[in-house]
Amino acid sequence: MALLLAAAWFGGAWAADPLGHFPVDPAQVSVSGISSGAFMANQLHIAHSAGIIGAGMIAGGLYGCAVDSVSEDGVFALASLAVGPCMSVPTLLQPVDFYAQLTADLAAKGWIDPPGNLARSRVYMFTGQADKVVSSKTIELGASLYRTLGVPGSQVKFRDQDLPGAGAGHSWVTQNFGNACDANAKPFINDCRYDQAEELLQTIYGPLQPPAVQPAGRIVAFDQTEFAPGKAAAANGLLDTGYLYVPKACEPGAAERCRLHVVLHGCLQSAEVLRDEFYTKTGVNEWAETNRIVVLYPQAHATSVAELSSQDFLSLFNTNLEGCWNWWGYAGDRQFLTKQGVQVGAIWSMVQRVTGQGN
């Protein structure tokens, strides 16, 4: 397995197998992410609220934050809004009613599920006091939007100034792995003596069994290209290979169905950059092993220098140099935050494949 994963990391000739079906209850699907992955988790949750029961957003996540306007064929979003108001100049953010109306408009067009589905959701949102990448106000507004869209306040857990983990930098926070707690640097996994995976999963699923000391399940590499339009994964910000953690109790043929949790890395955290670090070191797999949760780790792709050389000057503003998930409309995707979005659609197709609802 190590040799096969190495081939996937470095783009070797080896091609991963197709993603398979597993004994997963389609009514027990949830999603989480950090940074750009938090924005994508939020987009998945709101676009597919009929099929996702809960979401966790770490250091990101405000629906439509980079959207300027809506037209008949999609949304008009700006990278300048993403790096400005959404990340670093929160005083320029719109009031929560703007984002609520945007959500209603997209639902009226049939581009996302009716927001009324969100009332049953359970939501975890986190921002660290030392985060120098994404403003805490953005995450705070994201939590407010969930409440405005009908999620009861008791079902929205917003962690910012309160312990544990309050002093975190821009990172997924763990109990015993990663950078110093207040760091804002790769791998963007910080040791704050706080098991974020535990609280996130408990917020969504309720009480859990204690985690495994050493997960006994397996990591499965799978082919992501089949989920991209025309199998053009790289052109749409997707790596050729994604990963899945399968607990021993969730192998095909298991008598009892498991749950599915989708985890989305942030910028500079894909397997291109961190190898297996993100999908093995956040603490999620330990909890998944003992609580019958299959974990899907889709992978984003960073635009390479070679790919840049073939693009015109104006298109450079829509490139993805750090392997981020698409929350500002890069690659010309004007439906990036809806069910028709390339990445949202690809990830949802992966979910349907795992749960046996799709081909």
Which residues are covered by each model-predicted region?
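Primarily recognizes the serine-hydrolase "nucleophile elbow" in alpha/beta-hydrolase
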Residues: 26-76, 209, 359
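Gly/Ser-rich "nucleophile elbow"/oxyanion-hole loop immediately N-terminal to the catalytic nucleophile
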Residues: 16-36, 46, 51, 112-120, ...
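The feature captures the conserved acid-bearing segment of alpha/beta-hydrolase catalytic domains
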Residues: 65-147, 200, 251-253
